[in-house]
Amino acid sequence: MKFAHIADVHLGYEQYNQPWRAEDFAKAFKVIAEKAVESNADFVVIAGDLFHRSLPSPRTIKEAVETLWMFRKENIPVFAVEGNHDKTSRDISAYHLLESLGLLNVLGLRRNPVRGENVESLRIQNVYLVKGVVDDVEILGDRHRSKWQLEKVLPLLKPQSDKSVLVLHQAVKEVVDIDLDMAYELTINDLPEASYYAFGHIHLPKIYEFDGKAIAYPGSVERYDLREASKIVRYRDELVLKDGIRKGFILVKNFRPEFVEIETRELYDVEIEDESVEGLEKKFLEVLGRADKEGIMVAKLKSSDAVDVRRLSEVAAKRVRYAEIRFERILEEIEEVEIKQESEFFTEFELKLLELLRGEMDEDEVYSLVVEHYLSGGALKQEEGAEERVVEEETEKKVEEQFKGDEEADEAERRAEETEKAKSTKKARKPKTLLDFLGVEEE
């Protein structure tokens, strides 16, 4: 038993608003069909998103008919489910049009039974489960569903044969968790029994093994977005080139998957960085020189100075089929500033004065603090010599700033008079107020 597993064809997708990109997707589908026919496949499954939209254009439908006819001519039955892009809330979709032409069979729950050479309908309450049959192999499946809908639908997709294929367009948690950042609708434990799980929806080719069986995603047939680039280019200090994602389909032999690669248009994911504009442009031109002229390039350029993106885009348009260039400025790194504690700069007395400046002490407390400090020798006891005088002068300066004293000359004169008074009376006079103690006249 041999069959082709295809998914995410996205016929009609004019990527980057370029009509010729829709032609690329149609061409990829045709190449896959040719390879499937050459491999003598017994049947084909399409696991969703045959079309990019639920209402494809006449041109897109024509492209689908022409390729599916290749299978019809060889009597190779095709079984398909609708994906999230091309499903419709109506009873009839583009899939049913193709079904009426005898080009494919739509799997899943239906209001009415469908019967044919390779199709059976099983009544379940008031609906019918339409499934495919090729020799002794059952092909079951259903359209893209929400998580809560799957809870009701999956138990109905149980095979009656020992050999079966389950076709779904959903994301399985265990596969998504490998290296993809996307939501999922089900887990492996939710899946009904099957010999092979033919999935669509994830655009990167993935084959996940469990219990000797495969959950497989062939990926999209063409490069749907930048995550599916064929070449990854990084150029900072040196040029680094890496191969990207392969495109194709899966050929399944006796329920064992084998990926078959096809050639598609090159898509370059480019990031270039240089401090100078001149260096950046030189690197960009070097990368352009290596690119295929029929390829697509999406480039992010980083520099400290602004780059003329428009001019570079014009240059790139002459070297490749299509280019998108984005600029990102390199921001200077901000140095971390160490924040020191106030205690590292001020004495204990000065810290207490700071509390005054913040309005956290009343006048009586300040008065007691200053008197106690100066009567005990204050800052003069801390160190000797010139350093003592510096500390004292800085302390006096802070106090002067707090209370907005008069000019230094007047202040010195008043202190001299007070000193003479003290000598004549030989008795210390207790200051009446803090302002009086500091020699500042009250206004």
Swiss-Prot record:
Active site: 85 (proton donor)
Residue segments, region Disordered: 382-429
InterPro entries: Calcineurin-like_PHP_ApaH, DNA_Repair-Maintenance_Comp, Metallo-depent_PP-like, Mre11_archaea-type, Mre11_N
Comp. bias (Basic and acidic residues): 395-423
Keyword field contains Nuclease: yes
Cofactor: Mn(2+)
Annotated EC: 3.1.-.-
GO molecular function terms listed in the Swiss-Prot or TrEMBL record: 3'-5' exonuclease activity; DNA end binding; endonuclease activity; manganese ion binding; Y-form DNA binding
Xref: Gene3D superfamilies: 3.60.21.10
Regulation of this protein's activity per its record: Nuclease activity is regulated by Rad50.
Residues holding Mn(2+) 2: 49, 84, 169, 201
Record's cofactor remark: Binds 2 manganese ions per subunit.
Binding site residues for Mn(2+) 1: 8, 10, 49, 203
Keyword list, A-Z: DNA damage, DNA repair, Endonuclease, Exonuclease, Hydrolase, Manganese, Metal-binding, Nuclease
CDD domains per record: MPP_Mre11_N
GO biological process: double-strand break repair
Complex and partners: Homodimer. Forms a heterotetramer composed of two Mre11 subunits and two Rad50 subunits.
Family affiliation: Belongs to the MRE11/RAD32 family.
Described purpose of this protein according to its UniProt entry: Part of the Rad50/Mre11 complex, which is involved in the early steps of DNA double-strand break (DSB) repair. The complex may facilitate opening of the processed DNA ends to aid in the recruitment of HerA and NurA. Mre11 binds to DSB ends and has both double-stranded 3'-5' exonuclease activity and single-stranded endonuclease activity.
PANTHER family (UniProt xref): COMPONENT OF ATP-DEPENDENT DSDNA EXONUCLEASE (PTHR30337), NUCLEASE SBCCD SUBUNIT D (PTHR30337:SF0)
Protein name as annotated: DNA double-strand break repair protein Mre11
Organism (species): Archaeoglobus fulgidus (strain ATCC 49558 / DSM 4304 / JCM 9628 / NBRC 100126 / VC-16)
